[in-house]
């Protein structure tokens, strides 16, 4: 007598459940079906043959055990959706503000000692890639998943990141920190423009009013500025444009690839690129010939501190974006800009002129209005 066991199943993952978390065997996938209520069930054809019945009972028992594991995992709270404590948010926001200010102030101080932006970037990026590599070496949770050979598929990401960071650094080299926020004041308008052109995202009237206020702050700050060379303002506008391209273009890569892998590959390649460019432009040669003694020691010490701050800034920024809302993030950016301007006056001996004060205020108020308006639109749309 012959008998036939029929297993009819299709697996559909539960809501908010990653199917990869529960794939233990191919048999487990081939023997489950999800009904309209979202509960898994098994279907077997009946047979009078004792051997078939024994096989059927054995398979059923194993499947029921696997299903119990699935249901238990489904009932577990999602750690990503769990409420974040206020203490965590406070440390994330405060750390991002502190390290961002440190990076800007220390970079400007290093450039005041030795005007070698490419050499500085090369060292910082090499330091960052080394720190990420050491973290992977001693971590039991995170491991490297992408190799440097993957750079070919990340060429657009690497290009826009290098372009954006080099532009920002050269802008900082030609303008004082107290004017840095104003010189890059067109970042928000450029981002809105590129989002419309590339992503077809439209901006309503109220958020656009905040954008107009930002443009007014930029125009007011630049129009009455007589202490900054035109090249600094031009680099500020160019830096705003390249940063806007960066913010719009890299979203795809951030969601598709692990963050640490992107940081490592980008930092390693940018370090080599900036070093080669420093050699080709004779920046490295002039630095070696002209810098000696205590000047070189001071530059190296500041460079170490800025590189360490830059590494922690990457971690703090990603953490803040993860645990806070866009409104909280933009408010922290505004607070950082004000503190950064005041610290530039206190520690770098810069002068805060009237046009810079009004320009920064208009840019920050416009940015906050735009952010609050967009957040209101988001809540209305999701209601």
From Swiss-Prot:
What's an example GO BP annotation here? GDP-fucose import into Golgi lumen
Q: Where in the cell is it found?
A: Membrane
Task: Please give the positions of the paired cysteines in each disulfide bond.
Answer: none
- What protein family does this chain belong to? Belongs to the TPT transporter family.
Q: Which residues form a coiled coil?
A: none
| GO CC terms | Golgi apparatus; Golgi membrane
**Protein name per Swiss-Prot or TrEMBL:** Uncharacterized transporter C22F8.04
Composition bias type Polar residues, residue spans: 25-44
Q: Name where it mostly resides.
A: membrane
């Amino acid at each position: 007598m012959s008998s036939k066991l029929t297993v009819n199943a299709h697996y559909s993952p539960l809501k908010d459940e990653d199917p990869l978390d529960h794939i233990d065997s191919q048999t487990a996938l081939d023997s489950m079906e999800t009904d309209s209520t979202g509960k898994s069930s098994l279907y077997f054809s009946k047979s009078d043959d004792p051997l078939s019945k024994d096989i059927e009972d054995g398979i059923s028992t194993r499947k029921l055990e696997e299903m119990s594991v699935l249901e238990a995992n489904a009932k577990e709270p999602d750690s990503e959706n769990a409420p974040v404590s206020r203490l965590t948010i406070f440390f994330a926001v405060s750390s991002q503000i502190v390290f961002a200010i440190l990076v800007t102030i220390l970079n400007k101080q290093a450039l005041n000692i030795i005007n070698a932006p490419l050499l500085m970037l090369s060292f910082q990026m090499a330091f960052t890639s080394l720190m990420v590599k050491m973290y992977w070496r001693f971590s039991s949770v995170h491991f490297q998943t992408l190799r440097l050979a993957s750079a070919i598929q990340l060429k657009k990401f690497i290009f826009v990141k290098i372009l954006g960071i080099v532009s920002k650094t050269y802008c900082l080299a030609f303008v004082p920190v107290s004017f840095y926020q104003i010189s890059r004041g067109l970042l928000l308008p450029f981002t809105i423009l590129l989002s419309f052109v590339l992503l077809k995202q439209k901006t309503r009237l109220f958020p656009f009013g905040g954008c107009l206020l930002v443009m007014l702050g930029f125009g007011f700050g630049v129009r009455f500025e007589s202490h900054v060379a035109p090249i600094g303002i031009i680099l500020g506008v160019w830096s705003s444009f390249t940063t806007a391209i960066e913010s719009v273009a890299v979203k795809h890569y951030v969601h598709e690839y692990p963050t640490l892998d992107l940081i490592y590959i980008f930092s390693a390649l940018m370090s080599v690129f900036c070093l080669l460019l420093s050699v080709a432009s004779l920046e490295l040669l002039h630095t070696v010939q002209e810098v000696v003694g205590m000047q070189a020691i001071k530059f190296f010490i500041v460079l170490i501190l800025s590189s360490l701050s830059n590494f922690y800034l990457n971690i703090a920024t990603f953490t803040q974006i993860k645990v806070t809302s866009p409104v909280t993030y933009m408010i922290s950016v505004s607070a950082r800009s004000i503190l950064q301007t005041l610290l530039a006056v206190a520690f770098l001996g810069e002068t805060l002129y009237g046009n810079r004060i009004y320009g920064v205020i208009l840019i920050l108020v416009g940015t906050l209005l735009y952010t609050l308006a967009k957040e209101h639109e988001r809540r209305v749309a999701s209601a």
